[in-house]
Amino acid sequence: MKTLIRKFSRTAITVVLVILAFIAIFNAWVYYTESPWTRDARFSADVVAIAPDVSGLITQVNVHDNQLVKKGQILFTIDQPRYQKALEEAQADVAYYQVLAQEKRQEAGRRNRLGVQAMSREEIDQANNVLQTVLHQLAKAQATRDLAKLDLERTVIRAPADGWVTNLNVYTGEFITRGSTAVALVKQNSFYVLAYMEETKLEGVRPGYRAEITPLGSNKVLKGTVDSVAAGVTNASSTRDDKGMATIDSNLEWVRLAQRVPVRIRLDNQQENIWPAGTTATVVVTGKQDRDESQDSFFRKMAHRLREFG
């Protein structure tokens, strides 16, 4: 009798353990397959393409590639003597027209005071018209001077914000044209993550939900918050022909590939360019609250690691 009870107890314990293991594995599998996550995520940042507003020879480069710079710091300088001479010429024109305008103003005033008793109306009108023409030329010269001053100021290229200089491709002695990108500036404290979630997982993604970000090749888990979900993506299977008619690509009805939708995630703490913009990461959206790692089972931890490595 005791032997029978012992065998029954062992069998019952084995069955219970198998059931518990199955439940744990099933929960881990659900966690792995159904909760919102993706390995297709990238660190991003606000990038400013810096281009000069004037053309000329580069006379001085004050920074080096990948340097952290402050807002207003000089990056490089373009040929200033040429623009200084242009400003001096414009200032001379302004001075000339100021003197000429004063003379014509006095002449017109004198003729207006004398009136038609001393001269004809035509002569009076002519003096007034000459004055207006000179005043117009003076205003034009002043505008040219202001533009020359602005051009001279813009020969000094400064950093528009704190950030890292990257892809610096200007050197002393080179000629640079107006509007050509000289350097990119990655803004400091502007890093975020773009996670490309499958449309089937968007039900569990909402602005304000918490997220975990694991950079590729790192065991460190960063925390963040879902900032926004893209309002639309391009329909790659539909185009228009030259007559404006819709062209729909053929596909297999039983094979439907889920579209990926960009989800922007705001990082809790900026990482000071430890993971540069463009590097990849794994993102898991944990819901309204952070995941309690102390409550994770062994199988769930395994599932979490599987997400990171494939």
From Swiss-Prot:
> What Gene Ontology molecular function terms does this protein carry?
transmembrane transporter activity
The UniProt keyword set, sorted, is:
Cell inner membrane, Cell membrane, Membrane, Transmembrane, Transmembrane helix, Transport
Question: How does this protein sit in the membrane?
Answer: Single-pass membrane protein
Q: Which GO terms describe its cellular component?
A: plasma membrane
Any stretches that span the bilayer, and where are they?
A: 12-32
Q: What induces it?
A: Positively coregulated with aaeB and aaeX by AaeR.
Query: Does the UniProt entry include the keyword Ribonucleoprotein?
Result: no
Q: Name one GO biological process term.
A: carboxylic acid transport
Q: Which cysteines are joined by disulfide bonds?
A: none
Location within or outside the cell: Cell inner membrane
Q: What does this protein do?
A: Forms an efflux pump with AaeB.
Q: Which family does it belong to?
A: Belongs to the membrane fusion protein (MFP) (TC 8.A.1) family.
Name of this protein: p-hydroxybenzoic acid efflux pump subunit AaeA
Originating species: Escherichia coli (strain K12)
